[in-house]
Amino acid sequence: MEKLTDFVQEHMGDDLTRLVLDRKKWPDIDIDLAVSCIQSRRKLKGKVQEWFSNPSLIFPAGLSAEQCSSTATAVYKAGLAARIASSDGDMDAALEKIRGGWRLADLTGGLGVDSWMFSKFASEVLYNEMQEKLCMAAEHNFKALGADNIRISNQITAPDTIMEILGDFGANIIYMDPARRGEGGKKVFLIEECTPDVLTLKDIIFERCRHILLKLSPMADITMVCDRLGSSCRQVHVVATGGECKELLIWMDREWEGEYEVVAVELPAGYPDVEPARFSFKVSEEKISPLTLFGRNDIMPSLASRENTTLASREESRDLPHYLFEPGKALMKAGCYNLISERFGLHKLGRSTHYYITEDATKAETLKQLGKVYEIIDCQPLDKRSMKAAGKDYPRAEVTARNIPMDTDTFRKKLGVSSGDDAHIFGLKSDAHGNLLIITRRR
């Protein structure tokens, strides 16, 4: 094994196709495994840095490294599991009070990143994986990482094997991350098409354990998934980081009776040292929440007196500043469009334009944690004249088009601007004012 890991370190920057073609040069090395390790390490760099930095780890399947959790999402997941398992759902329990004293069974172990992170929070973890190569690699890697509280199981997760897998392991919570690839490696999104099929397993699992935590694709339809899973759905955590929605976490509680809660979570840079932003709501709240639109009588900084003025003079003379809020990926995936407006006192540009206006600087600062906030410099009807003027004043700017008769690339070309600087020009549709050109600066 040491020869293999040394070889991997020496050839991290090599052309992998060339390594495969030249395999006869290294008769003592399993080149296929070495290439898989190199591919995996490249994917893990910056994603799970502690694993990348440990030269002793081996990875027999490159796809597993691509699909595994990042350190940030794994930490969030483990913290959530700890709160669920050790406090029967008391989400306000202090983290220092819930470390240890509970057990988790991971029935779809994969590369093992989630099991490894769970082991840092739980007293014991059961890792089960159907692929023998992955299972053997995980056992080796856990030892190399010093994770000595993980049991290893190599079985297919199916209705007739659940009891055998769990054996005498008294799990407080069962975790599953169903594989989202069907025959021929094709991606699937319906929960019943994933492997294992949670719909056929959940009732059997509930005979042994009260809580189930599922990780699903961010592409999954939340309403459809919860309808299929039934009344035991208690919470749906929509987890985003780095400007991307990464995963859906479904907490199922055997004893739960009631409406499920949706929790939109934005993990900031520096997490877990920096607290994540959360926005929780129930679907029924969103349905009855009134829509507050940006109306005809609402005024933003205007370009009406553009002639004979410079950008500096317009900025100095404008009235109370307005802010444009662009919800983050977690909020958008969660489907929170009207309630965010109600809770923060925002005005939505249009029913289908999910951008919001506020004059309140304090609210704007808070909203930065849940998305992006821009200070509005100028705003006017979107037409040839306004685009020409904006392009002249801001030759370097970021550009976004939403719900107007052109996409972002076309809008950028018509403006004649190149990417860069701190200005951001939006082309957005307002129900009250039609298509608008809004010039902003990121806060």
Give residue ranges: language-model regions.
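SAM-dependent transferase fold signal centered on methyltransferase-like domains
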Residues: 1-443
